[in-house]
Amino acid sequence: VDEPQGRSGIAHYLEHLMFKGTKTTDPGEFSRTVKSFGAEHNAFTSRDYTAYFETVAVEHLEDVMALNADRMMNLAPPREEIVSERDVVIEERRQRIDNNPSSQFYEHMNAAHYMTHPYARPIVGWMDELKELDWAHAENFYRKWYVPNNMILIVTGDLEFENVVNLAQK
């Protein structure tokens, strides 16, 4: 809903880029590290928010929170990842929308129903706008919206609240 006009799909594209490296980690390192802990992780983009989540044993919580903090503050995917991930999102659109009549119907229905509201734009983005996305667009969106006062941290499990607060403040 917060995507700039003409940049539909930027939130979803950025979701993909969030796994492609920071100033201190290589592309895919986040996923490899989390998996090495025996943990699961994923992400999704909805109309109103993007969620990143991990299911991890409490003894690895500090490491996973540090990895998340790094990508939330220091995202820096290499150029080749920026281009290839845009192509991945374009292919995702082809598979999920363009090659699926019922998805096309719902996409057009939402566009007609919501008209001038941001919900008229598909989460994955309009194809012509996706093809124009680049790092400058993603970085601007990232710098504007990926800030602490715009995030919600949810941690559940066998742990002490004070410990989680201390980890979050690091």
Question: Which residues make up each language-model segment?
Answer:
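Charge-rich, well-structured scaffold segments of protease-associated domains
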Residues: 29-170
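Active/ligand-binding-proximal structured segments within catalytic/core domains
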Residues: 1-34
